[in-house]
A protein has these predicted regions:
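Transmembrane alpha-helical core residues of multi-pass small-molecule transporters
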Residues: 81, 96-100, 145, 158, ...
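Transmembrane helix boundary and interhelical junction motifs in multipass membrane proteins
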Residues: 62-91, 147-154, 165, 178-181
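Hydrophobic alpha-helical membrane-interfacial segments at the cytosolic entry of transmembrane helices
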Residues: 10-19, 170, 214-217
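Small-residue-rich transmembrane alpha-helices that serve as helix-helix interface/gating elements
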Residues: 206-219
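Hydrophobic residues within alpha-helical transmembrane segments
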Residues: 60, 64, 91, 95-99, ...
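Membrane-interfacial helix-loop-helix
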Residues: 2, 6, 15, 21-59, ...
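Membrane-embedded alpha-helical hairpins and interfacial helices in multi-pass inner-membrane proteins
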Residues: 166-172, 188-189
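Juxtamembrane "helix exit" motif at the C-terminal ends of alpha-helical transmembrane segments
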Residues: 23-29, 68-69, 76, 81, ...
């Protein structure tokens, strides 16, 4: 492996090393609702006294969680809602998750796109052609429906040649609905923790939440459907 290849793999290696260190040291225990319940008075007092700094710190910490694909990012948006309220917490979470996703996207594109193209050029060419025509709608759909792993959706568009600004905008718009839901859950977290209970993060799969998300996802796919209909030869 030459120095050029090593240099290209370095960003991804750093992200993977960070994830490995996090898991090996068992640091996930510090990012739990139990830990939040233990320190909520200190946290809320600090946020109230340093609102701007607290917001920036939250965004930075959350973005790092997403960039390193840490398995604790799911608690970050509810914590944002708890500390900052539903709407500010959702806005900060969207900004942070978008920034972290961009970091993964850039690392994957820098490290793997040429290698992926060399190993699977014919397949990639077909996928890339279809994805390029409808990349924004495809990615928006994937972001709206919380089915696929977040880290996987961060990587695939990079390998398929999606433009960064289109990726960033589709990511930002696509994660807004779920972020509002989870931040809303977090806004009521104080009472839940006081009762010694855990918040229900599965709420997003309840029908009164999931159906509107499915509706938005269908709307995101409409441009793809219309494009295919236009390409079909008329009888």
């Amino acid at each position: 492996m030459n120095s050029s290849t090593l240099r290209r793999l370095l960003p991804v290696a750093i992200l993977l090393a960070g994830l490995a260190i996090f898991l090996l040291l068992g640091l996930e225990r510090y990012f739990s609702f139990e830990m939040l319940a233990r320190h909520k008075a200190t946290l809320t007092a600090w946020v109230a006294a340093h609102r701007l700094l607290a917001g920036l710190t939250f965004v930075l910490a959350y973005a790092i969680m997403v960039a390193f694909s840490l398995p604790v990012a799911v608690v970050a948006t509810p914590v944002g809602g708890f500390l900052f309220g539903t709407w500010i917490g959702a806005c900060l979470s969207v900004a942070a998750a978008t920034l972290g996703s961009i970091a993964v996207f850039l690392a994957a594109r820098y490290a793997f796109r040429d290698l992926f193209r060399a190993r699977a050029s014919a397949m990639l060419a077909r996928l890339e052609e279809g994805f390029r025509h409808n990349d924004f709608s495809y990615l928006l759909f994937l972001r709206l429906i919380p089915i696929f792993p977040f880290w996987l959706i961060n990587i695939v568009p990079a390998l398929l040649g999606m433009q960064l600004k289109r990726y960033a905008l589709a990511t930002l718009l696509g994660i807004v609905p779920a972020s509002i839901v989870y931040a809303g859950v977090g806004a009521g977290l104080g009472a839940v923790l006081k009762r010694g209970e855990q918040p229900d993060l599965g709420i997003i799969f309840e029908w009164h939440i999931l159906l509107p998300l499915l509706g938005l996802a269908v709307l995101a796919l409409l441009p793809i459907l219309f494009a295919r209909l236009r390409r079909q030869p008329s009888a």
